[in-house]
Amino acid sequence: MPVSGWRVALEDFVSEVRGVYGPRLRGVVLYGSRARGEAGEASDIDTLVILDRCSHFWDDFNLLSPIASRVSLEHDVVISAIPIDISDYEESRNPLVVNARREGVAVA
């Protein structure tokens, strides 16, 4: 995929997520190899979707999965989307979240 192609896919994903969540969406953070600038041609797009009131992980995951799948298919790239409550994002000691806070790039 061309370098700019994954960015268009990410923009489309963020746009659809905004449409679903509205004011509950507090941000989208790109993390992993794309955020570090180390991505290869086949690298996926790793995102944390930061929400107000993300009290039921699987409910939000099930809302995000079809969006990520649809955009992934449209752009021939893999998007992973993990929902997380804003307070968990700010305070978690989970290594994935700590790493996303350290090297992540806010895209929304």
Protein language model annotation of sequence segments:
Residues 33:
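Basic/aromatic recognition patch in beta-strand/loop cores that engages polyanionic ligands
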Residues 1-26, 36-41, 52-108:
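Catalytic core of pol beta-like nucleotidyltransferases
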Residues 46-50:
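Short beta-strand->loop micro-motif that forms the acidic, two-metal-ion catalytic signature
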